[in-house]
Amino acid sequence: MIVRGRCLSRSISKLVSLSSRPVGIISAKSFVTTTNLLQNSKNDSTEASIPWYMREENSSPVEVLNDVEVPELPDNSPQSLQEFVNLLTSEYGLTDLEIFDLSQLPEDHPKSLEEQNDENYVILATGKSEKHIYKAAYELRLYIKHTYEHLPIIEGMSSNSISKVTRRRLAKRVRRGPPATASTFGIGANTWVSCGTGIDGIVIHLLSRERRKSLNLEQLYSDEHENEESYSSPDIDQDRLFFGDRRGFHTSCRKLNSNVLSKIYDSYVLNGNFDTSQKFKAQFDLSFKGSSIEEYNKKFDLYRAINLVNANVVNVNEIEQIIWDKYSSLDLASQSGIDWNTEIIHDTIKYMEYLVDLKTRHSPKEKLHKLSNFISNIMCFSGDSIDLFTIDKFGALLWRLTWVSKDNNALDSANLNDIIKRRGDSEPSTNTISFDNELGRNVRELLRQNKYSSNKETFPLWLREQMMYTFGQAGLWDRFWRDWHSILQSLNKTNERIYFWVITVLFLSKVDNRDALRHLLTKYWSNPSGVSFVADYTKNNNQFNSDNERMALKNVLGHIGEKYNTSPWAREAAQFADSL
């Protein structure tokens, strides 16, 4: 009865509402409603009579995915390039492929084949996400392994799993705290994966869309350079009216003032001298406001340059005071977005470079004493613990401070590589260095304990090579040959060993030490029972890595044969040079 009462009341209410409407509308609506009901009932009865597996699906149409555009291949490209392009697009679903033929670049381009021999073709591809890039890189590595039977060199690919070795290293670092370089600065782990395939000089870069836009690798591998500055728009606070406009105005003023200071600094570097140093300093101080990090950094750069030219205008204490003023500035302390740990690392490296540029004004002990006091003071402004030994450049500069020279033209890897580009240099080096053997031993042990403490870890190749050149220029030949032999044994590839042989001959010819040259050419040149240049040269099919390398060795050996023509070992080297 209750149910009937409810149904009756609902019917009465509907009847009352219908009676108040016009008759035409009621009859029309009732007719349409009746017709629709008849049609729906007919359709329902028809569908009910058809089995479910024979009914037509009433689903939305499937969207057709856009085909990936495959770029045109360069002329005379190898078949492997076509295989990788099809693999990246068809199998892995990567988009926005772009291919660069480095043989088409001009000779003075840093990525041309004249400047480097590792890369011939570069492929840039975009992935949908970090997981997509990781999966594509993983499959690409397996493909190269099974198809070409060798493992490619992949960088930037990291999984979430942690190995046992990594766990042990992290456990050792618990008490030290996180290193300053542990921050990813908002960059994902697999946003940029580089794969050196080792096949026909093909290098593949897999990037996310945001990372590809920020890195702009297209400009690196292309001949067209665009000098456009991009500034990020300031964030607008929705709670404060006109906050975004006001913030953008202040930011533009800081950039404008920084540009003015940069022009003064550039003008001094190009046209400044001993007499005009005071004028440039006064002009810079008049424009300096101290409202941004960039202004303080540019002031440090200018004062350092003036001090190296005219120490009477700017002394060492004034340079250090710039850094202390920056960290005690209330204006900078009130600004957000400043990573002070990064600034501390940056200023420490710049201060070490300044100590190196002082040459013989201070001894190695005095320079390291200044560095010790500087690090103790600047670490007071750090909220977190910073491990400077995790930075490779810190270790390299720390070793560089163990010796001084009148000129900063000491031989290193960069200078020797320039000699190869010039196809040889027969003039001996007149630069001598003063090496503090005790400090060198202490720094070496300090690096070993703080960074290379594991039994399985040794000094990296670049650091051992730097130490080796220091020992050779300091006349410590026993330690030079010990490190030289250790580096040669660690090189597994024949082409790397050939390059190391060439730069060794160039280094010894520049140092111009007769005993060292005789030791190399008699004991290691054609030794049948041990390591020798002739054996590695034969194993490399009597070829060098480049024509510049061949001509550099030919010219230097010819000069050695002419200078020491009375010695059999020099004449043998000259005969080999004639055959090149």
Curated annotation (Swiss-Prot):
Transit peptide, from-to: 1-38
Primary residence: mitochondrion
Name this protein carries in UniProt: ATPase synthesis protein 25, mitochondrial
GO biological process, one term: mitochondrial gene expression
Source organism of the structure: Candida dubliniensis (strain CD36 / ATCC MYA-646 / CBS 7987 / NCPF 3949 / NRRL Y-17841) (Yeast)
CC annotations in GO: mitochondrial inner membrane
Topology in membrane: Peripheral membrane protein
Gene3D superfamilies: Beta Polymerase, domain 2 (3.30.460.10)
Transit peptide as UniProt keyword: yes
Record's function text: Probable mitochondrial mRNA stabilization factor.
Family stated for the protein in its record: Belongs to the ATP25 family.
InterPro entries assigned to the protein according to its UniProt record, in alphabetical order: Atp25, NT_sf
UniProt keyword terms in alphabetical order: Membrane, Mitochondrion, Mitochondrion inner membrane, Transit peptide
SUPFAM superfamilies (alphabetical): Nucleotidyltransferase (SSF81301)
Cell compartments where the protein resides: Mitochondrion inner membrane
